[in-house]
C-alpha cells in the first residue's frame, strides 16, 4: 500500500521494547534491536511492520510476508519461517491490537477536523457552561446553558451539547454529533453524526389517532464506552436509557428508550433494540439483529447476525434465526432446508411419497 498521509508510521521501537509493552516474550533475544514502526496484515507486511497469526492456515501467506516480526502463541511458533522474529503472546489478537494503538495513538479517537488547541472563535458557548482545563472546542460547536465538560475532552466541529448535559474527562465527541439530556462518563468516544438523548418513540392510540407520550428520562453513558457513527440512542420515557461501562457500539445502531445495556458488550452495525429491553454484561450482538421490546438478555449471550429476538434469552447461550433459538438448532434446521432444496432440484416436478 502506498504511503498513508492520514496515519503516518511511528518513529520506531525496538522489538524488545514492544514485547515488554505487550507483556509478551521475544522468542529469540538476538532480535531485540530489530526496529518496527507499523502494523499490517500478514499477506502484505513489509520491513518495519508487525503482523500476527491465529491459525496454521496462515502458513501459505508467509510466501509474500516480509514483516519484521510476527506475533503468535507458542503452539504456532513452528509455522513462522525461521528468519522472521517472533513475539510470543497468549493472546496474539489482543497483542496486535495493543501494538496498533501504540504505533498510531491518534487513530484510537475520531480525527480532529481543525488544529484547534483550545476554543475556536466561532464556537458558541453559553456563559453558564463549565469547561475544565484543557477542553478543546472546534469551530461552530454549540454548548448549551449549564453544560459541564471535563478536562481533556474534545468537542468536534458542528457538534451540539445541550443544556445541563455533563460530559466527563478525556472524551472525544466527533464532528456533527448532538447530545441532549445525557450524563456521560470518562474516556467516552462518540463518533461523527451520533444522536444521543432525543425523544424516544412513544405513542398511545387514541380516538383521533396517536397521542404522544412524554419522554422525560435521561441517557446515562458510563466510562470508556465507544459509539459508532450515526448511531441513535433515545432518552428514557420515565426511566433512564443506560449504556454500561466499556461497551462498544458500531455504526448505525438504534437503541430505544429505557434500554439498559450492561458492561463490555459488543453491538454490531444496524442492530435495532426496542424500548425497555435489558441486556446483560459481555453480550455480543451480530449485525442487523432486531430485538423486541421488554425482553431480557442474560450475561454472555452471543446472537448471530440477522436474528430476531422475540423472547428472553438465558445467560451464556448462543442464539440465531427468526425467531431466535439455540444456535445449534438453527444451524441444523438451515442445513436440513439446504438438503431438501438440493433434493427438489434433482427431481423437478416429481411427486413425493406420503
Curated annotation (Swiss-Prot):
Region listing for Disordered, in residue ranges: 335-354
Protein's pathway: Bacterial outer membrane biogenesis; LPS lipid A biosynthesis
Organism in which the protein naturally occurs: Rhizobium etli (strain ATCC 51251 / DSM 11541 / JCM 21823 / NBRC 15573 / CFN 42)
Cellular compartments per GO CC: membrane
Classification of source organism: Bacteria, Pseudomonadati, Pseudomonadota, Alphaproteobacteria, Hyphomicrobiales
Biological process terms in GO annotation: lipid A biosynthetic process
Cross-referenced Pfam families: Hexapep, LpxD
Domain of life, source organism: Bacteria
Keyword Acyltransferase: yes
PANTHER family (alphabetical): UDP-3-O-ACYLGLUCOSAMINE N-ACYLTRANSFERASE (PTHR43378), UDP-3-O-ACYLGLUCOSAMINE N-ACYLTRANSFERASE 1, MITOCHONDRIAL-RELATED (PTHR43378:SF2)
Encoding gene, per UniProt annotation: lpxD
Family, as annotated: Belongs to the transferase hexapeptide repeat family. LpxD subfamily.
EC numbers for this chain: 2.3.1.191
Reactions it catalyzes: a UDP-3-O-[(3R)-3-hydroxyacyl]-alpha-D-glucosamine + a (3R)-hydroxyacyl-[ACP] = a UDP-2-N,3-O-bis[(3R)-3-hydroxyacyl]-alpha-D-glucosamine + holo-[ACP] + H(+)
Protein name: UDP-3-O-acylglucosamine N-acyltransferase
Amino acid at each position: 500500500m502506498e504511503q498513508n498521509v492520514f496515519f503516518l508510521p511511528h518513529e520506531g521501537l525496538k522489538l524488545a521494547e514492544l514485547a515488554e509493552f505487550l507483556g509478551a516474550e521475544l522468542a529469540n533475544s538476538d532480535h531485540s534491536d530489530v526496529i518496527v514502526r507499523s502494523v499490517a496484515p500478514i499477506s502484505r507486511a513489509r520491513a518495519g511492520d508487525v503482523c500476527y497469526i491465529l491459525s496454521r492456515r496462515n502458513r501459505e501467506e508467509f510466501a509474500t510476508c516480509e514483516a519484521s516480526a510476527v506475533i503468535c502463541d507458542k503452539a504456532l511458533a513452528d509455522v513462522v519461517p525461521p528468519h522472521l522474529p517472533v513475539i510470543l503472546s497468549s493472546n496474539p489478537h489482543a497483542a496486535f491490537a495493543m501494538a496498533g494503538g501504540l504505533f498510531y495513538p491518534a487513530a484510537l479517537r475520531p480525527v480532529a477536523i481543525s488544529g484547534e488547541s483550545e476554543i475556536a472563535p466561532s464556537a458558541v458557548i453559553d456563559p453558564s457552561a463549565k469547561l475544565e482545563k484543557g477542553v478543546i472546542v472546534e469551530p461552530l460547536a454549540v454548548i448549551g446553558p449549564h453544560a459541564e465538560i471535563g478536562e481533556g475532552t474534545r468537542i468536534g466541529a458542528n457538534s451540539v451539547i445541550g443544556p445541563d448535559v455533563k460530559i466527563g474527562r478525556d472524551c472525544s465527541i466527533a464532528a456533527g454529533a448532538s447530545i441532549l439530556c445525557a450524563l456521560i462518563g470518562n474516556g467516552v468516544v462518540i463518533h461523527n453524526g451520533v444522536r444521543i438523548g432525543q425523544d424516544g418513540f412513544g405513542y398511545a392510540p387514541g380516538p383521533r389517532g396517536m397521542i404522544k407520550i412524554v419522554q422525560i428520562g435521561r441517557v446515562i453513558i458510563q466510562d470508556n464506552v465507544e459509539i459508532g457513527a450515526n448511531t441513535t440512542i433515545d432518552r428514557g420515557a420515565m426511566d433512564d436509557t443506560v449504556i454500561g461501562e466499556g461497551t462498544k457500539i458500531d455504526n448505525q445502531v438504534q437503541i430505544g428508550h429505557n434500554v439498559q445495556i450492561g458492561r463490555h458488550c459488543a453491538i454490531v452495525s444496524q442492530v435495532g433494540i426496542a424500548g425497555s429491553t435489558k441486556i446483560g454484561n459481555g453480550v455480543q450482538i451480530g449485525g442487523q439483529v432486531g430485538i423486541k421490546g421488554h425482553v431480557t438478555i442474560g450475561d454472555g449471550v452471543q446472537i448471530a447476525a440477522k436474528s430476531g429476538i422475540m423472547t428472553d434469552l438465558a445467560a451464556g447461550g448462543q442464539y440465531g434465526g427468526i425467531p431466535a433459538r439455540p444456535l445449534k438448532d438453527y444451524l441444523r434446521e438451515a442445513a436440513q432446508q439446504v438438503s431438501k432444496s438440493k433434493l427438489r432440484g434433482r427431481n423437478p416436478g416429481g411427486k413425493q411419497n406420503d
